[in-house]
Amino acid sequence: MSVFTGWRAALRIARHDAMRSKGRSALVVAMIAVPVLGVTALDVTYRSVTPTTAEQLTASMGSADALFSDEDIGPILQLPDAERYEQVDENAPVDEDGPSIDVTTTFPKGSRAISIQSVPAGITTGYGIATTEIYEFRTSDPLARGKIDLVRGAFPHGKDQVAATEPFLKSTGLHIGSTTTVRNFGKKYTITGVVEQPDQLNVEALYADPGAVIAPWQARADHDKKVLPPNVGSKEWLVKGPEGVGVTWPDVMAANKSGVLVKSRQVVLDPPPESEIPLARKGVEAYPDSSGELSAALVTVVAMAILEIVLLAGPAFAVGARRSRRQLGLLGTCGGDRRHVRAVVLGGGLVLGGAGAAAGVGVGLAATAVFRPVIEEWAGNRFVSISLNPMELLIIAVIGLITGLLAAFAPAIVASRQSVLESLTGRRGVRRSSRVLPVLGACVLAIGCAVAVYGGTDGNSTLVAAGSVTAELGLLACIPVIVGFLGRLGSRLPLSPRLALRDAARNRGRTAPAVAAVMAAVAGSVAIATYMSSAMAEAEYNYVPVLNEDTVVISAFDDKAAARLPQARAAVERNMAVTGGHADFRHAWAGSDCNVYGDAENECGSVELVKPAGEAASCPLTGKGAKELAARLTADEHKKLMRSPACLVGIMSSGVFNAGEHGIVVADEAILSTYVKLDDPAAAKALAAGTPVLLNPVFAKNGEVTIKAVHAYSDKDKQGQKLHPGKARTTTDRLKVYVAPEKYAATPGINMILPRKTAERIGLRTQVSGSVYAVAHPPTGAEEQRTYGAIEQSGGGIWTQSESGPGGIDNSMLLILTLFAGMVTLGAAAITTGLAKADAEADLNTLSAVGAPPGVRRKLSGFQCVVVALTGVVLGTLAGLVPAVALRMVDLRQALQMMRMEPTESAYTPIVLPWTTLGLLVVGVPLLAGLLATALTRSRLALARRAG
């Protein structure tokens, strides 16, 4: 019999066995198909979400041939992709006040064009007032298709209609048919339709026809000086070139001579030779395309996913081989040898692996198509089409098929080693565990950890992936010994858990693969969850807040607006989740107030909080020798320096309380509890007595601070000039201060709180400027719009600020990972419970024969499930930490490189464990698995066929 004939028979037997045991076969197919499905969906989604060059051009210029824009720097040279350009004469001065170029004169003859120009504006909403961007862009023109598309309703036509994006409508409470007023000049517009930018679905904006907003606004501002003119953006043009010609490279270079930058579709898709590109001849190169680069995290995840498929399907094939041992024994009686037995089991892997791979690819494609709208909303851009790469899909299917074979390999070896007599009688015989395997596994585990860590320090993604997989394989080899050790722990436990532990130890051949399956699923999830938690912690640390958390600040533009602060406070208290009273603050200045008179042509006063001389008051990361110091620092040492009071001066936000860069805020003790969160009676007593409270101790020397004031007066400040004629004078005052604990140096916007009477005593002028509130949560969009609307109704001139946090940090992915790992853990535990039930039928019969109650069967199944799930989860957690730590070391290496080039860049790269995820996995999942196994196990004994 030839090799092919033998394999044909083996595949036929495997197919018949799969059809006979449909439940087990479906489980194996699902085990293989689910990861293949995920990888397929990920591949198709990535290809569909990542736009091609042609799709990017359509998103930026619609169906036009080119995008023209005036750069206002004179004649330029550009690369074909328009991403890089330079002045022809780099030394030529830029005439900012010169006449603007008529861009339309640079279009090719016979072209047609439409313009795009934007302006920020305050508009009325369903809740109050909001600020948004209004684009003057003829969205109904065919040239706009692909850049702006209609979702529902109609495009605007005429001077009193606008279209809106869906996010704008959701945030403002408006809808098609609603009217909105541009507050800046009082004109009403009707919303006629919903449009979207296919490449930016989250944009909040309004779209009007050219001339509908900017021109009437400017006309109103020209006639009414109380109306501020529109702050318009630069104008761009979508140009359709002559039919059949388009916009060519000579057209681009001709426009460059007038200072116009051109992105031409045909030039980008078919660039001219380098010899015809003047800027390229100067040595300027295009930005590199990094789309083909694979990150260390991606390589590691793919490698662990392949291993996970193998380990997940392995227990199911072990179930099949054990349940089919009588059939395999009959194969031996008919003259088959070990080679044929292995072929039958491997044939099962080939049959079920092929079915799982095909099902995974097919369902993955279908799932991507069905959930396309959800994926598009999540990604923030539309698919131009579902993009399929046949070669990649074929590789994914082949990997699924091969992993099915690999998963069946170990069960095939075990099945081929059983004697025919053992297979026919159902007896398992006695086989001692290998003493070499655990030692080898421990060595492999150590080597894998070392390789992964070295790869992390070296930034080598291949070594990180290889080391992580090697470490997991080493831990896998140690599982039989670990399971055997668990059997010794049950001597003092009640009957059911004691039997479960001993049964797991005695039957390591079926327990170990199930534990490995759980370990694989949990390891991947823990690795990703740990990496994500660490990245989130890093983002939170690096974020520089504008205000303290859960606070709202209202500030007046000038003294006239300050008179309306009581109405503004009432609006805040009525519309926001205020938790207490407010603290008022005042603006302090010397000479002429720079907020009123400060511009390029007029002089104004200044106030400065002077740092003491010496190294202690200077940040070593900003002065001379900073790079040399950074080269010697570790990440922890750099973090400590960056959070020192001296370095925080240059990091924390300023100007929030109309205080300028000096950070001196005139206020009373109420601001300590409302904003600073400093619960210190001594500090409050000091302010009440007229002693300033210093939050950043770097400005203090011997308990005193120095305030330098320049009393300069603007020519426009007639009253100041009259009272203080002559040259500007400079005063210096030393004040005793109460120094707060060092941690308060990180208070956003404030370096020192100065009592009003002390400020006036040293010659500073003060004016009530605003108030600060503590709130229960950051204001929602609706709350902000209601507050803004109420403030504008009272006369305006007051703005609100709140702290929104770092943003972009979403814990939903951690929840998804936890659910995935939990589901796989439950599945693997269910497999091993079913296998244990089949193997332990004789033991259960013996228990019943000696008088054990029926409930023992249920409890035994439950505890068997708990043993497998808990052991696998704990080992998987340990295995998952290896790649997570290694990947964070890759990030640390990159952060240190950046820090040594820019010493003030953060190198903080924490490793943070996702304790909630780990808690659910370690406690919740094994407990749930045990309860389900207990509930689903029958108490009654089934009649069994006599062995032999």
What are these regions (language model features)?
Residues I13, D17, S21, L311-G353, ...:
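Interfacial "coupling" helices/loops that link adjacent transmembrane helices in transporter permeases
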Residues G292-A297, W378-L406, R428-L445, I809-M813, ...:
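Conserved transmembrane alpha-helices of multi-pass membrane proteins
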Residues L169-A205, A646, M652-F657, K685-A686, ...:
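Mid-to-C-terminal secondary-structure elements
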Residues G23-S48, E71, A442-A446, G509-S534, ...:
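Short, strongly hydrophobic transmembrane alpha-helices
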Residues R342-L495:
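Hydrophobic alpha-helical segments
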Residues V481-G484, R488-D680:
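Juxtamembrane segments of multi-pass membrane proteins
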Residues S2-A313, V319-R322, R339, V344, ...:
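Membrane transport/envelope proteins' first extracytoplasmic loop
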Residues V361-E392, A452-L463, T877-G924, T934-A947:
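Short helix-loop junctions at transmembrane helix boundaries
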